[in-house]
């Protein structure tokens, strides 16, 4: 959702992004992360290949953010996520807020116990999904009764 939102923010009434891979370049530059070296054959190694660096930079959502009006967004992170580290969504949200030329909600929700798949437990995942649905429905609601 990061790249799609960056390219055409006006198309989205609200966005929910689950543990989004939005800081692609910095992740692919960090060989200490468990998945980075095994991803190089597919993505290219930006540490050794300037063309790979430039290509990844050209589409990395974090690197392609520019000032503008963004839709309301709820973005999640899992503190124990080994695939998309929690700081990726956090950096992205911080930059979105800094560049936003609007007052739309841009929310970061970090689950302090979750990994990449979100909450575990009998009802926790449904609770999180209901929260996101409520966020989206609230922001898509229209009519004179809607107050911003």
Task: Report each predicted region and the residues it spans.
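Active-site-proximal cap/loop segments of hydrolase catalytic domains
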Residues: 1-148
């Amino acid at each position: 959702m990061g790249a799609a939102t960056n390219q055409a923010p006006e198309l989205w009434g609200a966005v929910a992004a689950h543990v989004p891979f939005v800081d692609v370049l910095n992740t692919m530059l960090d060989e200490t992360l468990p998945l980075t070296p095994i991803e190089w054959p597919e993505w290219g190694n930006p540490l050794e290949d300037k063309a790979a660096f430039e290509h990844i930079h050209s589409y990395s959502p974090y690197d392609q953010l520019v000032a503008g009006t963004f839709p309301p967004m709820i973005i999640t992170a899992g503190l124990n996520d080994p695939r998309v580290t929690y700081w990726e969504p956090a950096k992205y949200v911080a930059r979105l807020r800094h560049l936003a030329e609007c007052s739309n909600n841009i929310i970061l929700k970090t689950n302090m116990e979750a990994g990449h798949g979100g909450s575990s437990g009998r009802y926790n995942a449904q609770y999180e999904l209901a929260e996101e649905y409520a966020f989206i429905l609230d922001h898509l609601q229209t009519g004179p009764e809607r107050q911003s």
